[in-house]
């Protein structure tokens, strides 16, 4: 689970339209989310808040195994508001939990007429005017000027972490990070060690000078010929004595290593098909370069259609206010048949290849790695469907089967990385086998030592049994489901708005661009189905006359159960991994009350219980058991209430 700082940083990238997953650094993020998840150690508590929209505070406390704490502050300046979920109670779990996902790289959209080709150009997936018109725009319209500042102080180590990122242009971004660690000893120990070192240095210098005087007085004929060599010898002896005295003082007074400060600059450029990254670290003079190239245009299949749907969202929302009913399904997309886009066997996707190079001028060392990735493309929605509000008591089996229909191909990501200097080769395969089940396997091999490791893991999303309506059900639905299916679930479960405050009602209507007429019809539909005879939530339409209850048909019951399971809210995720080295990890992440909880355990099957015995028969130190660590992490965050909302 992402901590609050990482969550805010990712939402900042989303608010500024920056795709961080297009970097070579995230080439294997899909498999790492399933196989390399972190298990919390000990007990930790995190409390965060947002007093004002651009300002965030976070406090972290760890009780076990050692007492530690940290306090941090975040300030962001963006054109659009950062939507971090509001609170830990309302945030979508799939936004804050590190999970398997397929993120499309931004690409130039192909839906533009020939008459407007001279007026606009496409850059990083966004449309901009020509250079003549671009010069008249301000800095905000150009995409620059947005920044984020973060600082955190850790206790008791007094380590300071800082981050500053600034959006230079629509395709350029600068990130500066700093880590400062103070010396690990108190001031009184430092003063005592300095006095001891000074006295040892003076004593060594006096003894060296006295020995040289005795040598000169005993043999004056050699004094003139060996003056230069004696001077060098005395200097070396003095330096060695001072170093030995300093080392002895450090051991005597318990002095630790001196403090250090590392400052790193990272410059990133994203054009959709190309992502380049330049970095420099001051501490060890480490230069780095990363590059990732996406073969083919991401807009070949799904992205173009999704871009067209996003451009026509205004027309869709306006037409949705006065729908033309065709049974209970509205066709808002194009009327092209699905037979035109059907392909043969195999997976349809796109390849991405990249590499990274690091060179340290101080340590005279270098590093190199390269990798390739294949990811499937999402389905192209040919006919987006939206259930129109009606007074039917239950959805038809056709609608339920449409909701529960699986994609034409399972979302799959295949990666392969190679480190030629270390001889390390790694291949990974991750796929979504069901709506809530993702499996992944990875094989690591070293060509020099012939050592290998096989790792397998899975994640399973838990849902509330019986289903739950309301906004939480809609917000907790699968984010990977195409937009039409999300629109279906949102409209069919709008009746669950009853009992929520007006703020959620307004937010729900704004997100789905629905008119009050549709909302009132949907609420009246629920009231008519329940037969409670109460008034509507919005109070815009009269309640329909109560109908005599009738026994539901088996087909309607099956459809209702399918729809209820589809709209059931997510309560958590269960992750597990096992490797050939007997390393086992189990992690549960979910929401309890208003808090986000992570509970994990790490075990090693090669460990044995009991004490081991030495050669003489005396018992030695006992070995660690199978369970290596158990951890619990609780996170809570909220924001100040908006007083402008009545």
Swiss-Prot record:
Annotated region (Disordered), positions in chain: 206-230, 315-347
GO CC annotation, single: ERMES complex
Feature: compositional bias, Low complexity: 207-230
Keyword tags: Membrane, Mitochondrion, Mitochondrion outer membrane, Transmembrane, Transmembrane beta strand
Membrane topology reported for the UniProt record: Multi-pass membrane protein
Sequence ranges of Polar residues compositional bias: 315-333
Localization per record: Mitochondrion outer membrane
Chief place where the protein resides: mitochondrion
GO biological process: establishment of mitochondrion localization; mitochondrial genome maintenance; mitochondrial outer membrane translocase complex assembly; mitochondrion-endoplasmic reticulum membrane tethering; phospholipid transport; protein insertion into mitochondrial outer membrane
InterPro entries with a match to the protein in the record: Mdm10
Subunit structure: Component of the ER-mitochondria encounter structure (ERMES) or MDM complex, composed of MMM1, MDM10, MDM12 and MDM34. Associates with the mitochondrial outer membrane sorting assembly machinery SAM(core) complex.
Family: Belongs to the MDM10 family.
Role this protein plays: Component of the ERMES/MDM complex, which serves as a molecular tether to connect the endoplasmic reticulum and mitochondria. Components of this complex are involved in the control of mitochondrial shape and protein biogenesis and may function in phospholipid exchange. MDM10 is involved in the late assembly steps of the general translocase of the mitochondrial outer membrane (TOM complex). Functions in the TOM40-specific route of the assembly of outer membrane beta-barrel proteins, including the association of TOM40 with the receptor TOM22 and small TOM proteins.
Entry text on domains: Lacks alpha-helical transmembrane segments, suggesting that it resides in the membrane via beta-sheet conformations similar to those predicted for other outer membrane proteins and porin.
Stated name of the protein: Mitochondrial distribution and morphology protein 10
